[in-house]
């Protein structure tokens, strides 16, 4: 009898890690979906693109494989699953043009049942918000537009068109031929700062920040080789990470960094920290307007700070380097395949589901 009890206890212990692992999963993209299964009967297959604080909660932008288009999902504190706001947006790849996008949509029409041709004028390259209202950028035509939920579904409202699109490119010189090549750059982050849209644009060395005036589409830039990252802050300000000293690849991984607040309105910078080691440099972060603090991602650990000198470990996520957004009570983290929610106060994982919806 005692041996049997020990055997049962051992089996329970073996099963415990699996149960805990399942509890840590908010959404995971299913694997090995049978291609013969009709699209409307397949499980929801999403590739998570981004998360942003908006509409009193957070909005997750995801590419829905079943419908070959972008969908928006909403979650706020107290909800037990994410609600689909709508979909049907075209996801702009960095090399897309209106012509190639049209060809891609025509191909989707030939393979996806009930595929609806998207509005390519309002295709989405990046999505962000001012904390409440959603803003999207279409890099194919430079259009910046708002997205809002109405009784009739999601509606778009044009804001402005960028005065030129060359600022979203990157150039490099071939040392052997001395030729200069230009191609579309990766856009790593986007934030609304008052009447300005700030876009972080990857360059051959480091980054630059493109500032678009939302009233008329005019552009100015923050550009120098030491600039390494841009994150959101309060009251029309950005956080800028800069590399101290040489900008070669060795110093990027072993050097030190400065952190400053940048006023979009005045161009003034306020130095916050110097000599920050590479391992303590932010991988991703989010401003918390509810506590006037900043949450910083350090691989799997989330730390909170108010002065960028002292830090308080808050929670951990099961995946590394998630992108995060905050609500009043929670931190929401996403990567390519998953969505997680942690309580700010207790650090517990909330298991949610994404509502399925046709179309």
Model regions and ranges:
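Structural motif
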Residues: 66-73, 141-147, 205-210, 247-260, ...
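Surface-exposed loop and turn segments in beta-propeller and other repeat-based domains
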Residues: 27-41, 85-118, 158-181, 273-279, ...
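Repeated scaffold domains used in trafficking and secretory/extracellular systems
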Residues: 45-54, 90-97, 121-128, 167-171, ...
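Short loop/turn segments that connect beta-strands within beta-propeller blades
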Residues: 75-79, 148-152, 213-217, 263-267, ...
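Short beta-strand elements that form the blades of beta-propeller/WD-repeat-like
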Residues: 49-64, 90, 98-103, 125-128, ...
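An edge-strand/N-cap motif at the start of beta-rich repeat modules
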Residues: 21-65, 72-74, 78-80
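Blade-level signature of beta-propeller repeat domains, shared across WD40, Kelch, NHL, RCC1
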Residues: 333-359
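Hydrophobic core
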Residues: 11-16
């Amino acid at each position: 009898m005692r041996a049997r009890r020990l055997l049962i206890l051992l089996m329970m212990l073996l099963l415990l890690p699996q149960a805990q692992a399942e509890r840590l999963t908010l959404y995971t993209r299913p694997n090995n979906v049978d291609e013969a299964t009709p699209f409307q009967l397949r499980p929801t297959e999403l590739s998570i693109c981004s998360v942003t604080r908006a509409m009193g909660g957070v909005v997750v932008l995801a590419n829905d494989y079943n419908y070959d288009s972008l969908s928006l999902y909403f979650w706020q504190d107290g909800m037990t699953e994410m609600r689909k706001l709508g979909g049907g947006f075209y996801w702009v790849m960095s090399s897309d043009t209106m012509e190639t996008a049209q060809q891609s949509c025509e191909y989707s029409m030939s393979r996806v049942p009930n595929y609806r041709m998207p509005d390519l004028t309002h295709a989405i390259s990046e999505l962000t918000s001012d904390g409440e209202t959603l803003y999207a950028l279409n890099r194919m035509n430079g259009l910046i537009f708002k997205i809002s939920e109405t009784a009739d579904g999601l509606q778009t409202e044009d804001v402005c068109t960028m005065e030129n699109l060359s600022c979203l490119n990157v150039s490099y010189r071939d040392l052997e031929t001395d030729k200069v090549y230009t191609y579309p750059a990766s856009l790593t982050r986007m934030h609304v700062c008052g009447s300005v849209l700030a876009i972080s644009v990857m360059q051959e060395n480091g980054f630059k920040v493109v500032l678009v005036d939302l009233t008329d589409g005019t552009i100015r830039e923050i550009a120098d080789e030491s600039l390494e990252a841009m994150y959101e802050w309060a009251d029309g300000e950005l956080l800028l990470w800069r590399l101290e000293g040489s900008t070669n690849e060795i110093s990027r991984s072993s050097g030190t960094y400065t952190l400053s607040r940048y006023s979009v309105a005045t161009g003034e910078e306020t130095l916050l920290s110097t000599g920050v080691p590479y391992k303590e440099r932010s991988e991703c972060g989010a401003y918390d307007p509810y506590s006037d603090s900043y949450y910083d991602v350090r691989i799997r650990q989330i730390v909170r700070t108010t002065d960028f000198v002292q830090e308080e470990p808050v929670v951990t996520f099961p995946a590394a380097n998630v992108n995060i957004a905050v609500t009043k009570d929670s931190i929401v983290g996403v990567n390519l395949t998953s969505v997680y929610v942690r309580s700010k106060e207790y650090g517990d994982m909330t298991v949610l589901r994404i509502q399925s919806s046709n179309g």
